[in-house]
A protein has these predicted regions:
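Short, conserved, GDST-rich strand-edge loop motifs in beta-rich repeat architectures
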Residues: 23-42, 85-99, 143-144
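C-terminal structured domain segments
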Residues: 111-166
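Surface-exposed loop and turn segments in beta-propeller and other repeat-based domains
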Residues: 7-9, 51-72, 112-125, 167-181
Length: 182
């Protein structure tokens, strides 16, 4: 039943370090008006071990069980089995939900930890489209309703964000690094 519930809403991310594939399902089908499209299953993560083609029957972690029913809208691989998730502020079964929090998911343990060191969630008005990842850290643009947007360096092991440079702009859609051409 888990495989069926993932169709149409999953995000597959390969752990580039060991080849495992993690499939993140935000369970967004809970918001569908048509009962035939709805699901009651939690947002969660399943895994396909490297070298296999089947879901690992012993691997399923509920994101909602760790967050009081909250789900996520996006996820990105950072390093090893660490993933960055853009989280909603309330369950999808409620109205007015917004994605204004970040969390780290550790694949091996299935543990989700909210990132500390960011501005208060009620001040966050947006994030960059995609984090820049380098040397085991994620760099994410964070826009708030107070002040200029800033780039935050996120340490996935400690789930801690450190504020970096602020940019005199209204929003930052992304951050990256230019490499010289040889």
């Amino acid at each position: 039943e888990m495989q069926r519930s993932l169709v149409g809403s999953e995000m597959c991310i390969r752990d580039r370090d060991n080849g495992d594939i993690y499939v993140f399902s935000p369970s967004y089908a809970k918001t569908m008006a048509d009962k035939r499209q709805q699901t009651t299953l939690d947002a969660g993560v399943v895994r396909i071990k490297a070298g296999t083609e089947e879901f690992d029957p012993d691997y399923y972690y509920s994101i909602e069980a760790q967050t009081g029913g909250k789900s996520f809208i996006r996820c990105w691989h950072i390093t090893g089995d660490y993933f960055l998730l853009l989280m909603y502020d309330r369950p999808l079964t409620e109205t007015g939900f917004t994605a204004n929090q970040l969390a780290i998911y550790k694949g091996e343990t299935g543990k989700l930890t909210y990132v500390t060191g960011l501005p208060s969630a009620d001040l966050i008005s947006g994030f960059g489209n995609t984090p820049y990842v380098e040397n085991g850290y994620a760099y994410m643009a964070v826009t708030t309703t107070e002040g200029y947007p800033s780039i935050y360096k996120i340490d996935p092991v400690g789930a801690v964000a450190t504020k970096g440079v602020s940019i005199e702009a209204t929003q930052i859609s992304g951050v990256g690094k230019l490499q010289p051409q040889n």
